[in-house]
Curated annotation (Swiss-Prot):
The lineage of its organism: Eukaryota, Fungi, Dikarya, Ascomycota, Saccharomycotina. Residues 1-34 have a biased composition (Polar residues). It comes from Saccharomyces cerevisiae (strain ATCC 204508 / S288c) (Baker's yeast). Required both for recombination and for the repair of DNA damage caused by X-rays. Its function may be modulated by interaction with other repair proteins. RAD52 interacts directly with RAD51, via its C-terminus. Forms a nucleoprotein filament with DNA as an early intermediate in recombination. Present with 6960 molecules/cell in log phase SD medium. This is DNA repair protein RAD51.
Length: 400
């Protein structure tokens, strides 16, 4: 893990982490904060350095200064700018409150929002909307960079381990943060089980494939089982109670509710460090809330809005987004030429919204097959993994 990555993660946890996640802060940083005022804020770090009591923290501050002098910025590493930073040049606290009430909790959220969305907020005039966009653009880098700089930023991305070395190798290290990974397949192919495993591995330290953050889990089918997290947490050396407390769970009951939950998710992620969002499954409610060809256009528009909101959360907070998807059988004449007539639902909207698409199939016993169907950087390949009591892993000798 690079020095830049270490600095970013440690600083994010000190500023936004709470509860048991503070235990993931390196021992020297955690101790320094406790010896200060005990609340882990960035102001305490500066105060400690100023008083001459923060030897290790002084080095951290110098490292931060060096990092700021380099080309890569914090936004590229998944950090975010608090929306309060917009309170300049005529933008008041009342304006910030209006933005928060409308679901915009970071400067990035304002910068990425279309102008017409800002104008729909009560009390935001055209002049104020322009001022908000200009100030957000000043804080959030949105211009051109060289391919070399972008390559450097991507080299700092974190990948979350799946619990299976075979699957991690297939994915180039694990599930990539900052993008959407879609898992599709029939029932009992391991999609939800992989989501349960990732809900735990996202909490483990970076040096063993984790993200040192919490998980936000949206369940649309009622398949989430906390008891599965207990055995998986024990496998990875985590306290089961801490692991459960670091998973924020919500059951979605309709497509509109599913979309509204992302507003609550944005607020939670602006207050604490998260490294993973799970939606299991993304299309289940759309299949029942929208029926027939007459509502197909409305369904796809709603789905596009939901997937765009997910991608914005990935962009703002640098989290990995994992969604599961169901399949449908093709009943047209193409079945005769296709050995596997099942395809993921959601159409082109779903296909274009997902960065990486993984197809899952059943195997022998507890074994499952995963295939890379679509990816901007991974070759088409497949691997075998297995599902055990302690989560997803590699097949064992007795199962082969």
């Amino acid at each position: 893990m690079s020095q830049v990555q270490e600095q970013h993660i440690s600083e994010s946890q000190l500023q936004y982490g709470n509860g048991s996640l503070m235990s993931t802060v390196p021992a020297d940083l955690s101790q320094s904060v406790v010896d200060g005022n005990g609340n882990g804020s960035s102001e305490d770090i500066e105060a400690t350095n100023g008083s001459g009591d923060g030897g290790g923290l002084q080095e951290q501050a110098e490292a931060q200064g060096e990092m700021e002098d380099e080309a890569y910025d914090e936004a590229a590493l998944g950090s975010f700018v608090p929306i309060e930073k917009l309170q300049v040049n005529g933008i008041t606290m009342a304006d910030v409150k209006k933005l928060r009430e409308s679901g915009l909790h970071t400067a990035e959220a304002v910068a990425y929002a279309p102008r017409k969305d800002l104008l729909e907020i009560k009390g935001i005039s055209e002049a104020k909307a322009d001022k908000l966009l200009n100030e957000a653009a000043r804080l959030v880098p949105m211009g051109f960079v060289t391919a070399a700089d972008f390559h450097m930023r991507r080299s700092e991305l974190i990948c979350l381990t799946t619990g299976s070395k075979n699957l991690d190798t297939l994915l180039g290290g694990g599930v990539e943060t900052g993008s959407i990974t879609e898992l599709f397949g029939e029932f009992r192919t391991g999609k939800s089980q992989l989501c349960h495993t990732l809900a735990v591995t996202c909490q483990i330290p970076l040096d063993i494939g984790g993200g040192e953050g919490k998980c936000l889990y949206i369940d649309t089918e009622g398949t989430f089982r906390p008891v599965r997290l207990v055995s998986i947490a024990q496998r990875f050396g985590l306290d089961p109670d801490d692991a459960l407390n670091n998973v924020a769970y919500a059951r979605a009951y309709n497509a509109d509710h599913q979309l509204r939950l992302l507003d609550a998710a944005a607020q939670m992620m602006s207050e604490s460090r998260f490294s993973l969002i799970v939606v299991d499954s993304v299309m289940a409610l759309y299949r029942t809330d929208f029926s027939g060809r007459g509502e197909l256009s409305a369904r796809q528009m709603h789905l596009a809005k939901f997937m765009r909101a997910l991608q914005r959360l990935a962009d703002q907070f640098g989290v990995a987004v994992v969604v599961t998807n169901q399949v449908v059988a093709q009943v047209d004449g193409g079945m005769a030429f296709n050995p596997d007539p099942k395809k993921p639902i959601g159409g082109n909207i779903m296909a274009h919204s997902s960065t990486t698409r993984l197809g899952f199939k059943k195997g022998k016993g507890c074994q499952r097959l995963c295939k890379v169907v679509d990816s901007p950087c991974l070759p088409e390949a497949e691997c075998v993994f297995a599902i055990y009591e302690d989560g997803v892993g590699d097949p064992r000798e007795e199962d082969e």
